[in-house]
Amino acid sequence: MWNLKNQRSGFTLVELAVVVVLATSMSALLAPTLKQVRSQGRAMSSEGNLWTIGQASGMYALDNENRIASYSWRAGETYINLSNGSSFTPSSDQDAAAFQARDILYRATGRTAGQFRILTPTSRLVHRRYSHLILADYMGSVSDRVWVDPNDFNQAVWQDFPTFYDFVPYGQGLPSSSGYDNSSSWATNSIRQMWGFGSSYQTVPHAWMSDELPSYAPISDTPHLFVSAGGSPHLGDRYHNEVAFPASKVYMFEEFDRERVGAPYFAYGYTNPAKLMFDGSINTMVTRAANDSVSPFDFGSGSTWTQRYLPIDKFPVPIGGLGDSTELNMHYRWTRFGLQGIDYPTPSPKVFSR
């Protein structure tokens, strides 16, 4: 028979102290690993987002004469304002696209009147940061998480609270610190309202503009704002069959490599943000492995286009800190020969199959 009086019911204080020390040490050792695993899991989810977007792009092309999804409203055409039923005729393709973006958001949100009525963002080229709205509208939701890198926590918050303008870039006005993109137009409500419908993924410019001049190009002191180059550009009307090497040409890409410390801008050579190629595959090769960029002001010059990264308020800062003047090769953002060109000579083998 067991002598219950002599049975040990638990740890002694000394043993318990040893267990606590060991558990604490193991937690300290495992914490970075678990953090990396979670980040890598989110990275795979981001690649899955891009794969889904690629499938939707293919379906859009089938339904729209093989067009690459882009704004289709045109200068000189007459359209109806959903907020009041009046008609209007845009004077440029840039303005027409802004009105089309407003129309999409009117229908998606119902915000056609009141304090948070959707305004027309005519002060900006909406193609630059909101080309995805055409495909999002086609997919049925402009606020789907498929447009957000799971590591992009800011964009997730802006999407969840689209009318909390205080949360978004320049919601508190222009930053007091130097080294940010301080164009005053960022702090207007017609721009603030758009962040709730933004995306972590950027569309390459040649998906919505010509491979030749006239076109658009970044202004000298920031990669975020564009100006027309060589005249009045015709926007949109690009087709998938114009892409000469679909497996080697980037279509959309993570603007930041958020799986790395500091979430560096895609143009740093050592980064490997996920990239959706025109054939629907996912490329995770490092940026420096891509071919050099070409000047968007002179596509025939052969000169490599470099530019410093100037952060938007609430965006990741440069690797060298605010004010970093390092010139970065923009690689696949400005592809030599546009849709006819090659970004990665050796295509990435990563292809999602679901």
Residue ranges and their predicted role:
Residues 1-6:
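N-terminal secretory signal peptides that target proteins for export/translocation
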Residues 7-38:
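N-terminal single-pass transmembrane signal-anchor helix
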Residues 33-50:
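Aliphatic-rich helix starts adjacent to a transmembrane/signal segment
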Residues 46-47, 51-354:
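Short, well-structured segments within or immediately adjacent to enzyme catalytic domains
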